[in-house]
Amino acid sequence: MSRVIVKGLPIYLEEARLRAHFLKRLQQQGRGSEDQITDVKIVKDKSGNSRRFAFIGYRSEQDAFDAIEYFNGSFIDTARIEVAMAKSFADPRVPTPMREKRREALKRLREREDRILAEKRQKQTKPQHGIDAEISKNKQLQEFIETMNPKMAAAAANPMARAAEQPASANPLLSALHGAEDDEEVDMFQLSEQESDDEYTDLHQRPQSAEEDELEEPAVGQDLDAAPAPDAAEDGMATNQEVSDLEWLKNRRIRIRDGEDAEAAPAPQEQAAEEPAEQEVPQEDEVSAEEAALTKIRATGRLFLRNILYDATEEDFKQLFSPYGELEEVHVAVDTRTGQSKGFAYVLFKDPEHAANAYIELDKQIFQGRLLHILPADAKKTHRLDEFDLKNLPLKKQRELKRKATAAQQTFSWNSLFMNQDAVLSSVAAKLGMEKSQLIDPENSGSAVKQALAEAHVIGDVRKYFEARGVDLTQFEKFKKVTERDDRIILVKNFPHGTTREELAELFLPFGKIERLLMPPSGTIAIIQYRDVPAARGAFTKLSYKRFKEAILYLEKGPKDCFSREPRGDELLEGDAAPEDVKEIKKSVEDVMDADSKTPSSEATAIDGPTVSIFVKNLNFSTTSAQLAEKFKPFSGFVVAQVKTKPDPKNSDKKLSMGFGFIEFRTKEQAGAVIAAMDGAVIDGHKIQLKISHKQSSLPKTSKGSKKKISGKIIVKNLPFEATRKDVFELFSSFGQLKSVRVPKKFDKSARGFAFVEFLLPSEAENAMDQLQGVHLLGRRLVMQYAEQESDDVEEQISKMTMKMKKQAAVSKMGALRNSGKRKIDMSDDENDGLNGF
């Protein structure tokens, strides 16, 4: 509950001032953002005057309780206010409104009227043949009817035929019998004193004059159109001298259709007016709105949410509804022009029953300071083919449609930076200025190694490109194990070499605004970030496994928190900015330097405590540690700079640069300022790349709990069975001096699918692990990890050997126990021994 009610407000108080008054408490706590107060509503009457109470919604429940504790009993001007937790409509403690009470009373009254009307109709629906049967039983009544109306004597002999030819209201006596109650006795011979026999003798005679027609009721057999209108006496047409006889005759003329009997006219006007009331069909019992909503939700499993925050995200609703069941989709409607939320959302459950439970529990409840209004939503429109339609398609088409339908649930967790091998080779060949056929010699056994090295080179360039543009590649390794992904980020893979950035933009722009598009110069992979989630979701659904040129696009959703900064420069799609030259970068360095940074710091100053290290990549191999320090000394907080080197195998007295190094600063803020200023700067003709290193300090540590030493031995898994020791040696020897390479084999001389590679230095093993990550050899992705390093401690080695011997002894003992329970039995001897007693 994060919504409070404020009572006793001044009648002149406005919502803006009330919001500002309650925002003061959040400002005192250092959280003065207006987003923390989600809703302010002063309740007013029909005339627009304040009813002196209001509702205030908070984003968090903790802020709501703090506001109650702080503001309850306080004053706004001279009015003492009362602050308490608001109740939702679903709270049983809330009294029933008068409107709801009136609705229930009207419903009960309508049900009572329908019941009385049904009983009355049931009594009035007595069959016509029942009246005829009573007349046929009473001979005196039959004689009376025949005497008064000789023309109906023949019809009286056949009551059923007479009932079919003559309407029920043709005889006043029959009408009296027809309208009588079932439980009352009707005397057939008792007539009213005002009635006489003349009414029956003149039943089928025409009226004698127009005056009598106006005063008396029309005869039963006369047509209603022939009867004078009620206002005939008022218009005075008969006495008007200006009206000719012909006009008066035309006014009195009636029309009789062919085959229509004049006597079979409808009932009199008064009776016709009463018939609609008697034939009124009662309304059916209306199903309550609650039951109708639950029925629809159980059919669709989809909910429509209203009155939500405009900055509410899909994650907020996933956390709210996921406890009730597994969710299939959460969609917040977004305006495609502005990118802002429209204030409503849809939630789709896999099980409709879970959706019904969520509707019962959460409808009209308080969420983020607002009353959440939930309605049943229509079923989502899908264009999927059913199983019957799929069976009529070719098998290849069936697989293609099924793969495209399940694309959103599939993940390439085995390699996020997957690249088309043909595109990789084409990129390397174009970079070297040769044909692809010249790069790979089909007659050479080392072609697979060359292809793997080419892929490693391209992957290295792609990593450098992404890291320079704020892509956190560590998230790609984390999200293999975690299912959380960002729906706005799409990884585009497997497109042909030569695809340009403009072609990808043209393909993805129709679905919505693109916030960022990253495509390395190698042109083997791309990352697209949409502004809105619905746009990215639509592009992913429509373009997954779509044929693009001569290849098929592979799309994958990117990990959460993939980007460490906002897009800028050439990352934006609106217009690629020209890359800044070195001089401009140097100017930006001077802007971020402190005033005292030009004064060289004393190198002899001792640094106490941990420092922050910056990892520098893509250094020129001729750049030394002194030259690197000269570039970064002007920055405040500089400690030391070092270029990593390795021994020269040709000359043991010399060392070779490894192309990267580390720079240490006193604080993280100083290191961040240096990265913002120098990332992408040019040193000795190389554009360097900077990022925070996980290694926090290069100072020696005397602590026993220091990090375990990195091993120089690597175990290579998922190795192709066709790969030989020579292939493994050629692949890894490019990254350092190898000490040993071992490919274990089975008893039949076939490979076991893994190998051990040991480098001379642990740093070389680390470099190989970094460069060969995600590389394929003979179509298989190599999986590498450090092998367990042998301990230099003699006692530890002795304990390991002791444990190994104990394990072997236990295995031997268990084998002996199993064998002791087995012995050879001669069944023939046993049978003979059993028969000796007989």
Swiss-Prot record:
Q: Which Pfam families match?
A: RRM_1
- Subcellular location, record wording: Nucleus
Q: Which residues form the RRM domain?
A: 2-88, 301-379, 488-560, 612-695, 712-789
* UniProt region (Disordered), positions on chain: 195-219, 225-244, 260-290, 813-838
**Chief location:** nucleus
User: Any idea which UniProt keywords this protein has?
Assistant: Nucleus, Repeat, Ribonucleoprotein, RNA-binding, rRNA processing
- The keyword Nucleotide-binding is assigned to this record: no
GO terms, molecular function: RNA binding; rRNA primary transcript binding
Q: Where is the composition biased (Acidic residues)?
A: 272-289, 828-838
One Gene Ontology biological process? endonucleolytic cleavage in 5'-ETS of tricistronic rRNA transcript (SSU-rRNA, 5.8S rRNA, LSU-rRNA)
Fetch the InterPro entries from UniProt: Euk_RNA-bind_prot (IPR050502), Mrd1_RRM3 (IPR034482), Nucleotide-bd_a/b_plait_sf (IPR012677), RBD_domain_sf (IPR035979), RRM_dom (IPR000504), RRM_dom_euk (IPR003954)
* One GO term describing the cellular component: nuclear speck
Functionally, this protein is described as follows: Involved in pre-rRNA processing.
The UniProt similarity line reads: Belongs to the RRM MRD1 family.
What name is this protein filed under?
Multiple RNA-binding domain-containing protein 1
